[in-house]
């Protein structure tokens, strides 16, 4: 798919902006704090319904204004899709796809598929399991709305169960109905995540071999908190979760929260058999994340039938010239958006192969 046009009104430091994009490569170039990432963020917003930098939509609206408007036109193989987001400081945001208002956020997913790679993504290797769960969940949600709804349901049930445990410490509580529902939704989460990791691990391994010239072997391993076998069916997984919830009930009661279940899942990255988080060099960690992101491109292509768009925010300067070259020259079928402060990135790119946008204080020169 291709983002053909972007229109912004009162979005961050943009008052009014209309841009038409190149089908292959688009470069946003400029000094720090001019509005390069804001452009990437606005495109991402039309894909995910929220920013990747903040959970507060208010921050996206220009400081001196009360409303903001974002519109992208996406060209797909079989159709054109218009996505509109209206942000309002006094009420919830309005989303429209092809002029039809959306009732739930889940309806937006899948209209525009994006893969974002920014320096923040290093957290995926460096930080705790919640970053890796977020990665799995965001990526599965963009290819399966059923997963997205099951996850929201699971989180709601979990909140209820935790409240019950927290406010009834030392008292008898009837938790079984909640356990039943939690296990039913949780079992599906495990099935989806297991399936996703199975696919992405194969693609990431291939990708990593390619970028490291076969020197390194990357493994991506799913680590569910409730131990399940590779071929366990959903009913079996549900029983296993129920069993775990029962066994941990006294601990849960003491601590006032649910200590087992898919909300504690993790994913491990290994290079040549060693955990990248503990043993990987800075460069290896970066390359592992890059391989994972490039694997996502292929995974979405396989699931959706077209490549997603690729958003690269501030990552060029962090990659060596070989990897930079790969991103700029090898992804011929993927529309790519790059932010950079250096002209260097553009050298040996033919003018007809890209569009360059000089970003200066919320204006494009
Ligand atoms: N709600 C807002 N209203 C007005 N201006 C805003 C708003 N939010 C952010 N900005 C301005 O946007 C600018 C930052 O934009 P952005 O993050 O896109 O910079 P950048 O060009 O990517 O910079 P860098 O190279 O440092 O990453 C800042 O100057 C900031 O003051
Ligand atoms: Mg930036």
UniProtKB/Swiss-Prot annotation:
Provide the GO MF annotations for this entry: ATP binding; single-stranded DNA binding
Alphabetically, which GO biological process terms does the record hold?
DNA replication; DNA synthesis involved in DNA repair; double-strand break repair; SOS response
Q: Matching Gene3D superfamilies, A to Z?
A: P-loop containing nucleotide triphosphate hydrolases (3.40.50.300), RecF/RecN/SMC, N-terminal domain (1.20.1050.90)
Q: Which residues bind ATP?
A: 30-37
Q: Which PROSITE patterns match?
A: RECF_1, RECF_2
Pfam name, any one: SMC_N
> Can you tell which superkingdom this protein's organism belongs to?
Bacteria
> Where does the record say this protein resides?
Cytoplasm
Statement: the UniProt record of this protein carries the keyword DNA repair: yes
Q: What is its main location?
A: cytoplasm
GO CC annotations on file: cytoplasm
The UniProt keywords, alphabetically, are: ATP-binding, Cytoplasm, DNA damage, DNA repair, DNA replication, DNA-binding, Nucleotide-binding, SOS response
Please give the family membership noted in the entry: Belongs to the RecF family.
Q: What does this protein do?
A: The RecF protein is involved in DNA metabolism; it is required for DNA replication and normal SOS inducibility. RecF binds preferentially to single-stranded, linear DNA. It also seems to bind ATP.
Q: What is this protein called?
A: DNA replication and repair protein RecF
Upper classification of the organism: Bacteria, Bacillati, Bacillota, Clostridia, Peptostreptococcales
């Amino acid at each position: 798919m291709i983002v053909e046009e972007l229109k912004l009104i009162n979005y961050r430091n943009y008052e009014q902006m209309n841009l038409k994009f190149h089908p292959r490569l688009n470069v946003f170039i400029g000094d720090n704090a001019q509005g390069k990432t804001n452009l990437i963020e606005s495109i991402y917003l039309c894909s995910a319904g929220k920013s990747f930098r903040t959970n507060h939509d208010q921050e996206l609206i220009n400081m001196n204004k009360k409303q903001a408007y974002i519109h992208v036109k996406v060209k797909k193989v079989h159709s054109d899709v218009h996505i509109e987001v209206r942000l309002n400081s006094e009420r919830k945001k309005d989303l429209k796809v092809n002029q039809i208002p959306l009732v739930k956020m889940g309806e937006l997913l899948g209209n525009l598929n994006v893969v974002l790679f920014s320096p923040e993504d290093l957290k995926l290797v460096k930080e705790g399991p919640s970053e890796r769960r977020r990665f799995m969940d965001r990526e599965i949600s963009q290819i399966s709305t059923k997963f997205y709804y099951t996850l929201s349901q699971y989180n709601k049930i979990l909140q209820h169960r935790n409240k019950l445990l927290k406010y009834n410490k030392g008292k008898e509580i009837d938790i079984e109905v909640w356990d039943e529902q939690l296990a039913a939704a949780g079992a599906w989460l495990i099935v989806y995540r297991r399936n996703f990791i199975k696919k992405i691990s194969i693609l990431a391994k291939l990708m990593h071999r390619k970028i490291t010239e076969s020197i390194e072997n990357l493994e991506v391993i799913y680590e569910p908190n409730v131990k399940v076998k590779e071929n366990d069916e959903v009913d079996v997984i549900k029983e296993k979760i129920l069993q775990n919830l029962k066994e941990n009930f006294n601990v849960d009661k003491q601590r006032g929260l649910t200590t087992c279940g898919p909300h504690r899942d993790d994913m491990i990255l290994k290079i040549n058999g060693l955990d990248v988080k503990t043993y990987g060099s800075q460069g290896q960690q970066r390359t592992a994340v890059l391989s994972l992101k490039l694997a996502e491109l292929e995974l979405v292509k396989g699931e959706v039938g077209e490549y997603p768009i690729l958003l690269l925010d501030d990552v060029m300067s962090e990659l060596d010239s070989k990897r930079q070259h790969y991103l700029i020259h090898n992804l011929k079928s993927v529309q790519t958006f790059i932010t950079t402060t250096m002209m260097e990135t553009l050298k040996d790119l033919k003018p007809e192969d890209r569009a360059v946008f000089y970003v200066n204080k919320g204006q494009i020169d």
